[in-house]
Amino acid sequence: MSGLSNKRAAGDGGSGPPEKKLNREEKTTTTLIEPIRLGGISSTEEMDSKVLQFKNKKLAERLEQRQACEDELRERIEKLEKRQATDDATLLIVNRYWAQLDETVEALLQCYENQRELSSSGTEVPGCQEGLTRDVIPRTDPGTSDLREPLPMQFRAPLSEPALAFVVALGASSCEEVELQLQGRMEFSKAAVSRVVEASDRLQRQVEELCQRVYSRGDSEAPGEVARARTRELGRENRRLQDLATQLQEKHHRISLEYSELQDKVTSTETKVLEMETTVEDLQWDIEKLRKREQKLNKHLAEALEQLNSGYYVSGSSTGFQGGQITLSMQKFEMLNAELEENQELANSRMAELEKLQAELQGAVRTNERLKVALRSLPEEVVRETGEYRMLQAQFSLLYNESLQVKTQLDEARGLLLASKNSHLRHIEHMESDELGLQKKLRTEVIQLEDTLAQVRKEYEMLRIEFEQNLAANEQAGPINREMRHLISSLQNHNHQLKGDAQRYKRKLREVQAEIGKLRAQASGSSHCGPNLSHPDDSGLNALAPGKEDSGPGPGGTPDSKKELALVAGATSVASSVKKEELVSSEDDAQALAPGTQGLPSRGREPEARPKRELREREGPSLGPPPAASTLSRADREKAKAEEARRKESELLKGLRAELKKAQESQKEMKLLLDMYKSAPKEQRDKVQLMAAERKAKAEVDELRSRIRDLEERDRRESKKIADEDALRRIRQAEEQIEHLQRKLGATKQEEEALLSEMDVTGQAFEDMQEQNGRLLQQLREKDDANFKLMSERIKANQIHKLLREEKDELGEQVLGLKSQVDAQLLTVQKLEEKERALQGSLGGVEKELTLRSQALELNKRKAVEAAQLAEDLKVQLEHVQTRLREIQPCLAESRAAREKESFNLKRAQEDISRLRRKLEKQRKVEVYADADEILQEEIKEYKARLTCPCCNTRKKDAVLTKCFHVFCFECVRGRYEARQRKCPKCNAAFGAHDFHRVYIS
């Protein structure tokens, strides 16, 4: 990284100004390196320190020189950038104005050609020609125009002498200054301008022909000689003015060229002044250099004098050697004096050159200031006295007067138009006010009818909403009713099946009873037990059939009777359970809104009926065939039991039917409550759900209690009947189940207590809900009353609507009458519109006249604008020529500067030649002395030592490092470069591949 940084530093440091490098290369052949006197040195360290001090001085001088060169180069770069920016801006402006010039010249020529065509085709309509010229002129593109090709000479009309002179002046002024890339454009511009001049000359000739026709016509007619003389005078004056205008244009062109030349001279003098300033700075720098050199020489001279006076007489022992040294010191002293005189002469000559340049600079500055003052203080009287200014002033006054007349006519026409419009608008406003009054009446009546209609619609909407609510309630109750009907139909079908089974079992029972009677008869004959069985009761047997089947003594009849009894008991139990399930389902539907006490009886009865059924089922199979001795007593008991069971079943059916009726009534009430609770808030619904859950929990608790009782009774019975291991195992299981159920009972009791506490709260809430239901029922009654009132009001509204329809029909008839009046007024309006059209036609004529006059005004304005554009175009041409001259001036200044530089270098070379001649003469004088050969030999050795490479001390110096300008042999430099030791052996300055070159010393 250090090597790279050294390379960059060396590269930056070596970039000096090219001019200085050239001067340095020129002077290397002539300048002599002065020896440096280090004085008395006692050691190598002291010598190194003195050498380093001298090197530091030299480096400081080089740094100052480099900074000065950098400042000069920066100033020069800034000047060049400013000049380039100004040149670009002027080029852009010239290009833009040149394009505008081409477009305007093409438009002028096209306009003139169109006027010529119109005048040649229709000379009998001169009044319309001016109006048409404005519409016929097309906008042509300068790049695609046919004007790029100039007309041939045979089709051009002959020009007058002033016009020819003007065209020739234009051609002579532009052809010499045009470059190759702009020749086509310049040719087009010259051709266009020449054609414009031709057109103006042709117009002048047409005017002269018209004047001659007028004169000839006037010669045939006697009266009007004064007018003819006046026209002749005017024609002569017009011709004279046209000649004067062309002459003035030529003069303006010539003056503009002279002005541009003067301006170019001013710019050239300014550049000269700048160059002189730079040369003065260079000369001052040379003077400073010479002064420094003079000071050095003075120091050397003083040292030589001191050595001459003191040191050389004491330095040696032999007189010959001392004498030789004295002669050498005297010779050096004379040489130094001669050099001092030469330098003084050179300084005097340079001073004379500087004074001369200073005088030239002051003269150029004075002329520049004088020209600037003259340019700034251009008087206005000169501008006002020009013919163009006076002509434009006269045209402006004429156009201004015409515009004032046109404005007055336009104001009069606008006043008439406004008066007619105001009268028409007043009539229309009167009719509109009448129409608005009638419309307001109609609107008020229609608004009243709409209000009544809106009231009727509101009543209708309220009735419709109530109907939809009732319909929705019926739709909600419909699915429940359908489910109940479906359940009832399924239960009826089941009852029919059970009835069929009962009939079949009765038939089988009769057959069994007949067999039993036969068996009894056989048994009475065999065992003499006739009195006990001689009084059978058919009704009793029919009623006590299940009991008999259970306690029948016959071995063959017992299984059938047991099966029939089990089926009958199952049928009755199924019927009762189905009815109970029907009641439970009906109560569950209404349970969400009904109080908790209504659903408990059916669930309470169900656990009461279940243990009886289970006991019957257990007792049925558990009763085995009794012994033959106790058959009659058991038969009586079974009959009594069967009668009691049938009586209980009939009572149970009656109770279930009554409960079914009550449940249906409660279901209807619950439907109403359900509709009411659907509109209740969510909190009350949650309370009702809690109450329903509480009822279910209570029912489960009761059911569990009944099951526990049944299980306890079953355990007692089984403990009496069964004493084997199976019974004990069942008892243990039952006890475990009892413990589990007791634990569950304790939990349910706790839940029951919590639910009871909640029931108190929910009961209070239920009472509040009942009060709210009462209020809602009251509101429903009030709504019904309001609905009845609305119905009555609706009837009244229908009657009012009929009356309003009749009034509307009457109003429609009135509207028809008003429409007829409006039609009549429309007829009058049409007549007024016809009058307005007639007025508008007259107004259109006035406007046409106004447009014609405005077109004439615009034509005059266009002529004025064209004249102004022509002046601007001429100015642009002038600026273009000036820019061309400005472009040429830097080239001239550069060539002049190059010549001056060459002359300056020539002078310097002559001075160097004279100095070398004087040195040669001095050397020739030195050869006269006796020991000159020895001196020359020593000098030759010294020079050879200087010419040998200090690195290898064998080869000659033939390569120079451009970074520090130390000289070595090419092989050493290349070897160090290839070995990547890219630093100078003397000053340790880094160098690159392009920083060492061969040197040929001759």
Curated annotation (Swiss-Prot):
Name listed for the protein in its UniProt record: E3 ubiquitin-protein ligase BRE1B
Subunit structure: Component of the RNF20/40 complex (also known as BRE1 complex) probably composed of 2 copies of RNF20/BRE1A and 2 copies of RNF40/BRE1B. Interacts with UBE2E1/UBCH6. Interacts with RB1 and WAC. May interact with STX1A.
Cross-linked sites for Glycyl lysine isopeptide (Lys-Gly) (interchain with G-Cter in SUMO2): K579, K580
N6-acetyllysine found at: K20, K356, K518
Pathway connected to this protein: Protein modification; protein ubiquitination
Pfam families in alphabetical order: zf-C3HC4
Species: Rattus norvegicus (Rat)
Tree of life domain: Eukaryota
Compositionally biased tracts (Basic and acidic residues): 18-28, 603-620, 634-652
The protein's Enzyme Commission number: 2.3.2.27
Family as reported in the entry's similarity comment: Belongs to the BRE1 family.
Tissue expr: Ubiquitously expressed. Expressed in brain, testis, heart, liver and kidney. Weakly expressed in lung, spleen and skeletal muscle (at protein level).
GO molecular function: mRNA 3'-UTR binding; protein homodimerization activity; syntaxin-1 binding; ubiquitin conjugating enzyme binding; ubiquitin protein ligase activity; ubiquitin protein ligase binding; ubiquitin-protein transferase activity; zinc ion binding
Zinc finger (RING-type): 949-988
Matching PANTHER family: E3 UBIQUITIN-PROTEIN LIGASE BRE1B, RING FINGER PROTEIN-RELATED
